[in-house]
Amino acid sequence: MVERALRKTRVGKVVSNKMDKTIVVAIETSVKHPLYGKIVKRTYKLKAHDEENQCQIGDKVKVMETRPLSKEKRWRLVQIVEKAQ
């Protein structure tokens, strides 16, 4: 039996939940500037599948890589780490 490779997971903040069963998650990373060496924050957004429409804007969520679900959706919600205030 062939084992599947571990899927990527990311933790980010929900910035939009206006689509049905879809959330937009902003992921913040820190990278070192190639020339100056300063640590710079980079933010990128990805769309994730939220089957029960349970996320609200501001929630901290964990998403996992999955098969393509639509043109731009390749991630799905694993859990809500922290609810928004």
From Swiss-Prot:
Instruction: Name the coiled-coil region(s).
Output: none
Q: Does the keyword Ribonucleoprotein apply?
A: yes
Q: SUPFAM superfamilies this protein is in?
A: Nucleic acid-binding proteins (SSF50249)
BP terms from Gene Ontology: translation
What do the Gene Ontology cellular component annotations say?
Answer: cytosolic small ribosomal subunit
- Name the Gene3D superfamilies on file: Nucleic acid-binding proteins
Q: Which CDD domains match?
A: Ribosomal_uS17 (cd00364)
**Disulfide bonds, which pairs?**
none
Q: Which UniProt keywords apply?
A: Ribonucleoprotein, Ribosomal protein, RNA-binding, rRNA-binding
Q: Which InterPro entries match?
A: NA-bd_OB-fold, Ribosomal_uS17, Ribosomal_uS17_bact/chlr, Ribosomal_uS17_CS
Single Gene Ontology MF annotation:
rRNA binding
How is the subunit organization of this protein annotated in UniProt? Part of the 30S ribosomal subunit.
Q: In UniProt terms, what function does this protein have? A: One of the primary rRNA binding proteins, it binds specifically to the 5'-end of 16S ribosomal RNA.
Family named by the database record: Belongs to the universal ribosomal protein uS17 family.
- Its recorded name reads Small ribosomal subunit protein uS17
